[in-house]
């Protein structure tokens, strides 16, 4: 029965992954992500049903567009596969069981899916464009408020802690508004701060702090490798110039998902040892 559940979760996950690839491409271009038909970005030909089956279409078409024969970027296959596996792992660490599936479990799993959607979209867009998309940030704030209301009303969580998170949201949004008025552009830093607050709401302090530490280490390693490779280049960039090209949101999101899965798995392991 568990295998059947994991197959279902994997299939749901790869369809979400297909949506993620579409959204990461379209959102920065401000294109519709729900009603506009999928099309090839090279020849603009509308894709048929057989072109839209996650993973399988990529394999059967040998990684090429059926209409213009242009190569399809492997990120589509990678993200769809990883998304499917992520859903399976989430179901496993949350101990989902078809025979004993409670309403609370369904709600908690749904909130995690909404959160994963936020993390993947904000991270993917940042990796492709080095930009913290404001629409995705707003989506993160909305699902955070929904989750906080759920925790406070249903699970009687500490309302003061979430009140602090709301206050932090307001402060950062005010700073972002000031930055927008003064410099006529959204601040990358405020986008990162909004992302961190959303991480705090869904994953707690421990996972968030761990994610930040891993991100800083990854950035330090990246800078070190760059220095070693480019040390003989007379026109090499400074650390400050390089840091402006690093997609911090991507590293932060990736490390957060890994940290969250690891903590949930360890929690289950401790309960199993003690039980």
Residue ranges and their predicted role:
Residues 1-275:
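A membrane-topology feature that recognizes alpha-helical transmembrane segments
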């Amino acid at each position: 029965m568990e295998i059947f559940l994991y197959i279902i979760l994997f299939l749901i996950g790869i369809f979400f992954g297909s949506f993620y690839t579409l959204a990461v491409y379209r959102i920065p271009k401000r294109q519709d992500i729900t009603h506009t038909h999928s099309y090839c970005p090279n020849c603009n030909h509308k894709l048929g049903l057989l072109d839209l089956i996650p993973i399988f279409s990529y394999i059967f078409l040998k990684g090429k567009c059926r209409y213009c024969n242009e190569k399809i970027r492997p990120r589509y296959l990678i993200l769809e596969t990883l998304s499917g596996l992520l859903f399976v792992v989430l179901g496993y660490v949350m101990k989902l069981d078809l025979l004993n599936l409670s309403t609370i479990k369904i709600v908690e799993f749904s909130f995690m899916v909404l959160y994963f959607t936020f993390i993947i979209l904000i991270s993917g867009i940042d990796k492709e464009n080095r930009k913290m998309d404001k629409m995705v940030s707003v989506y993160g704030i909305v699902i955070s408020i929904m989750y906080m209301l759920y925790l406070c009303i249903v699970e009687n969580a500490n309302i003061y802690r979430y009140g602090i998170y709301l206050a932090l949201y307001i402060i950062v949004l005010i700073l972002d508004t000031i930055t927008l008025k003064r410099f006529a552009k959204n601040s990358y830093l405020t986008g990162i701060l909004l992302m961190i607050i959303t991480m705090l709401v869904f994953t707690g302090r421990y996972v968030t702090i761990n994610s930040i530490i891993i991100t800083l280490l990854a950035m330090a390693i990246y800078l070190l490798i760059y220095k070693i490779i480019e040390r003989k280049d007379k026109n090499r960039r400074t650390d400050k110039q390089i840091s402006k090209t690093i997609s911090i949101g991507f590293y932060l999101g990736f490390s957060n998902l890994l940290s969250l899965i690891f903590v949930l798995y360890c929690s289950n392991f401790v309960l199993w040892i003690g039980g």
